[in-house]
Amino acid sequence: MTKRPVLIKEAILVNQAFETIDECLEQSGKLLVDNGDIEPEYILSMKEKVEQHPYTTYLPGAGVAIPHGMSEGFKYINHTGISVLQIPNGVDWLGEKVFIVIAIAANSDEHMNVLASLGDSLESEEDAKNLWKTNSVDKIYDILS
């Protein structure tokens, strides 16, 4: 995989509204497809992860979901990348209200590095809430970069 930015501004959408997890996965996956990070099949892998290992796809109490694919889906990743959906009114994610969806496309070698980096970016509840409240792609980009 060639080295390129993991997050680009074109992969961030603010002021979104979704009714279901599935809609979130479709849109976040579409952003990754449009940027060449994944093949469409990886979206199915993200859906499988939510179904089979649901509690590995969000941060309880933080209002943040971090969907990613199963290891079998790694073959559909072209480049490590993330997409971000900001949902001001939230969406129900396994009984929790989620306001930010950060979809990850990373192979096993890079997956933990991406998660650690996101963890650093969302270290405080205040940082997470800033993501929920801003209307600025630039601000979300700055917080997560």
Each predicted region: which residue ranges?
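Cytosolic covalent-transfer regions centered on His/Cys nucleophiles
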Residues: 1-145
